[in-house]
């Protein structure tokens, strides 16, 4: 069953990305966050990030920040919003698709960095499982997966009562081959600022943002 994405129109993006009272991140927030992501990815890869896949990219706003940080990096965005693709697709290299269909829309990897920010908690379990497996085939470096869970206090159109616990997502990552590795070696760091916790998996080179361990499991530091 395909999700109805028609509500991701200009009014939606105006409210959550531009309205000063409702927007979830400012341009300064985005610079700090992507700066952290790119720096961490390059530390793990021991080389510059040259290609980025942004899944659920919306209007492709991360592409403008990436251009400031790494002018030569190749950006590919994927989003289900017909409005976003029509308005920004050609200018920002955005293709129409979703996490679940990314394997069928001609996206060619591997990518040094895969971004999936504030998307996974909106995706149905079957599509999520399928999409994570597809991301694994496109990953050629680091994947940054940002998820809001039932243990989070989040703003925006996030519905906490429909969210899963951190341990549920961890299990999905393991089954998709995105977290566990043959060496069993993990390095976890706590990021400074905004009270956000990040797990950096050294061997499989995945960064996940999940809240501290609470009911149902999660991340321990």
Where are these regions (language model features)?
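Short catalytic micro-motifs in class I SAM-dependent methyltransferases
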Residues: 118-122
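A conserved beta-strand element that flanks and buttresses the S-adenosyl-L-methionine
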Residues: 115
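Class I (Rossmann-like) S-adenosyl-L-methionine-dependent methyltransferase catalytic domain
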Residues: 1-107, 123-138, 142-221
